Regions:
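N-terminal small-domain helix-loop-helix segment of the aminotransferase-like
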Residues: 2-93, 98
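Short conserved AdoMet
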Residues: 29, 58, 104-105, 152, ...
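Short acidic capping loops at alpha-helix termini that bridge into adjacent secondary structure
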Residues: 32, 82-86, 106-109, 154, ...
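Short beta-strands and strand-loop turn motifs
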Residues: 35-37, 131-135, 157-163, 189-193
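PLP-dependent aminotransferase class I/II
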Residues: 67, 216-270
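PLP-dependent aminotransferase-like
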Residues: 102-160
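Active-site pre-lysine segment of PLP-dependent enzymes
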Residues: 125, 142-154, 166-189, 193-226
């Protein structure tokens, strides 16, 4: 006899992970494969990062710092903000989920581009909200004017993937700032900068600076890609204290494990 589940999950497609490299080699009789599907770094973490991970193994009988204080302080120093303006999560994906939980209700909407990161539509389904998918501009980037035009009184969250996954098109900080000027200043905007480290534009990094003066803006980043820490799951967000309080209100008490915290902290030193 099946269990009775929430009506909300009926429309959520089950995530089907790709085959592991071992499964692909076994299925096709290969001796090696090059995996590109998940945008993972082909390089392992730095030796210094491996060393702090090894040292941290002795303390696995203890809970991690639930507030990730050392990591928050280091990230706050890097971004020239107060530690209360930094949120730390089990990957930046968790912070995006927390944003949906904290902001969305049935009858509200979340606006995102299409195609973009496949996780965004799930936020609406998981919370009973409605997802508004705005087609990309002809250049493959976010059509920010169209996204602004899609905002109405039901909109609670706008997500901008910058550079966009999967097209790789980057919107400048000036374009993001112009978009912020077009929408209500109390409408939450999350800029997902998972691929920030691969941007060559001269204004790279300035979007996170906007978060110092735009209380409705949260910028998320991850240690998975450039730092090679996919397997440890650690990411962070820079935003107003109001944004961070909202995210902290819905997170688990010990959401970022100890090894992830020390590995991320050491990664910032290199």
């Amino acid at each position: 006899m099946a269990i009775r589940t929430s009506d909300r999950i009926a429309g959520i497609p089950h995530y089907e992970p790709g085959l592991t490299m071992a499964e692909v080699m076994d299925a096709y009789g290969l001796s090696s494969v090059v995996k590109l599907a998940s945008n993972e770094s082909p390089f392992p973490p730095l030796p210094e990062v491996k060393a702090v991970i090894d040292a941290g193994l002795e303390g696995l009988n203890r809970y991690p710092d639930g507030a990730a204080r050392a990591l928050r302080e280091a990230l706050a120093d890097r971004h020239a903000v107060d530690p209360g303006q930094i949120a730390v999560g089990n990957g930046s994906c968790e912070l995006i989920v927390h944003a949906g939980t904290a902001l969305l209700d049935p009858g509200t909407t979340v606006i995102h581009a299409d195609p973009s990161f496949a996780m965004y539509p799930h936020l609406a389904a998981e919370t009973g909200a409605e997802g508004v998918a705005v087609p990309l501009a002809p250049d493959g980037g976010h059509d920010l004017d169209a996204m602004a035009a899609a905002v109405d009184e039901r909109t609670r969250l706008v997500i901008i993937c910058n550079p966009n996954n999967p097209t790789g098109v980057y919107r400048s900080a000036d374009e993001i700032e112009r978009f912020l000027d077009l929408i209500p200043d109390d409408l939450a905007v999350l800029v997902d900068e998972a691929y920030y480290d691969f941007v060559a534009a001269p204004d790279r990094g300035r979007v996170s600076v906007l978060a110092r003066t735009r209380p409705n803006l949260l910028v998320t980043r991850t240690f998975s890609k450039a730092y090679g820490l996919c397997g440890l799951r650690v990411g962070y967000g820079v935003g107003s204290e109001a944004w961070v309080r909202a995210l902290d209100a819905v997170r688990q008490p010990f959401n970022t494990n100890q090894l992830a915290q020390v590995a991320a902290l050491e990664s910032l030193r290199h």
